[in-house]
Curated annotation (Swiss-Prot):
Record-level Gene Ontology MF annotations: collagen binding; collagen V binding; heparin binding
Family: Belongs to the small leucine-rich proteoglycan (SLRP) family. SLRP class I subfamily.
GO cellular component: extracellular matrix; extracellular region; interstitial matrix
Record-annotated LRRNT domain positions: 278-315
Protein's job: Promotes matrix assembly and cell adhesiveness.
Chief place of localization: secreted
Oligomer status and interactors: Interacts with numerous extracellular matrix proteins. Interacts with isoform 1 of MSL1. Interacts with isoform 3 of RASSF1.
GO biological process terms, semicolon-separated: extracellular matrix organization; positive regulation of cell-substrate adhesion
Gene from which the chain derives: Ecm2
Protein known as: Extracellular matrix protein 2
Motif (Cell attachment site): 266-268
Subcellular location: Secreted, Extracellular space, Extracellular matrix
Amino acid sequence: MKLAVLFCFILLIVLQTDCERGTRRQRRRMHQRRLRKSSSFHLRANRQLEVQQTTAAPDARLPTANSDYSVEENIESLLSNLGVESSYSVLPGKKGYCFVKGMIMYNKAVWSPEPCTTCLCSNGRVLCDETECHPKACPYTIKPEGECCPICSDAEQESINKLHKQVPPPQMEMDQVAIKEALQSEEDEEIAEGHKEHKKETSVPTKIHGDGERTERKLRPEKEGRSAHQPLYHGRREEEESKEETEREGEEEEEEEEEEEEDAIRGDVFRMSSRVIPGTPRGRPRLPRSCSLSYRTISCVHADFTEIPPITAPEVTNLELVGNSIISIPDEAFNGLPNLERLDLSRNNITSSGIGPKAFKSLKKLMRLNMDGNNLVHIPSDLPSTLEELKINDNNLQAIDEKSLSDLNQLVTLELEGNNLSEINVDPLAFQSLESLSYLRLGRNKFRIIPQGLPASTEELYLENNQIEEITEICFNHTRKITMIILRYNKIEESRIAPLAWINQENLESIDLSYNKLYHVPSYLPKSLLHLVLIGNQIDRIPGYVFGHMQPGLEYLYLSFNRLSDDGVDLVSFYGAYHSLRELFLDHNDFKSIPPGIQDMKALHFLRLNNNKIRNIHPEQICNAEEDEDSALEHLHLENNYIRTREISSYAFSCIRLYSSIVLKPQHIK
């Protein structure tokens, strides 16, 4: 019996709590509905105001007769309440047709004679209707509170009012009346709904309360026993409070979701994100004037520095000090940049005596060092062993001894162009420790022979603009990986090239001997050669079978600006290259006709014969008449010769797919 009474009492408390929560929830919903309805009612009131302003009473007019005996009838428009007098005639004698400005309009035809006017032909009568034209532009913008961007307000009604000659009532009065009516109607609805819900919610508690009064008399003797169950009651009370908190949190989440949905629907308004925009990092290093920081690079280009600026930035990996007036590098110049990987000190006035013995000691991760355009007379000592690229071009280097590059076993690129180096002041063991070197530039120096002791790992060797006269048999004995040799602008003669100088090189693919003293194409070329450049020599002959031993075969042969003539080339001159040659440059020579063998070069894509003395092109010199396949030629240059283009046979270029790839003009007239 005690448990039953206790259960009824707890149930009464729970129902009362649910009733209070439902009342609060109902008030919140009614408040939100009131806000939505007030805003929608305000918009409807504005629209009704616009319609009322544009509405005018039609004037009754009598039919009038026109000069062409047609009757003009003015009636009220069927499309709106606005009556507009029509100035269009009805076609006499044609029932159901209308005659408008010389045009016949069929029955039910609709047209617009002018903006904001629509006309209808109905059983021989012209019915016109003038509609409201909404302004295309936004005449007035407002910026709501708490928003970032302006929005367009209601369009002004002045243009419409002037059209109908009406004075609208004050906007403030209409707004106040509309708002009062909306609030009054909503309050009435809320009161009625509140009464209904209150009756439903209070019906059950009333019944329980009546039962409680009956049982109260029975419970009086048991008050003492009820106190024994107080701990149980408090425990359930705490559970109910926790449930209320969870339900309250759920309601708040629902409200937030509703607000998000409203924001998504109202997508024309921009809302600022609640997240904080990150500011400038506090760890940004202090930089001297005229310097900039980009990612991990500090750039101080042309900043008029006379010394290395003191910078402390452990996170920086690149430092550019190009184009300053720096003279010296003290021992502790880069102590604040321990993670530096690339250092550019080009175009300064740094001298060898101004570099401290421990200037680069703190740079344990330095990989690239550029010191072009300074006043160094020898390579700085104690360079980091991590260096992979070292550039000391355009200095005044006088010598390279055995220890200058001794610790740079990871060096891949070494550039020493534009100095005073020669075979006399460069020790034969200077490059011995460079085990990883693959790219070596020694151009614009004073070498007379190929430097001795080149690293075995060398792949590209640049020796242009020197005074080299001879290539001996032992020059490339230890460089079996070499793929490119550049020897242009030297003094090499074919008789001074040893037969075994490079014929056994298995990886050598490119040789540049331009602007030397060659009189014919050198013999004993490497078997692997693909690219041979002999521009600007005095070559007057291509010996037979000079390319015959090459595998897979020569692909690029450049012989421009030489002295080749018809007598210097025969059918066996290109033997071994007919199947492989892709580009052949024979321009600026002394040819008087197309060289023999051109039509047999099946892989040829680019042929230059311009600026010669060619006068005639025979049908089978470029295209073979016995073959039906098209030529692979894509570019053929024959300009600046003495060819009479009108006398060229129609079969001369029949194998070339595109005539636009043939250049014939201009020609010399003589």
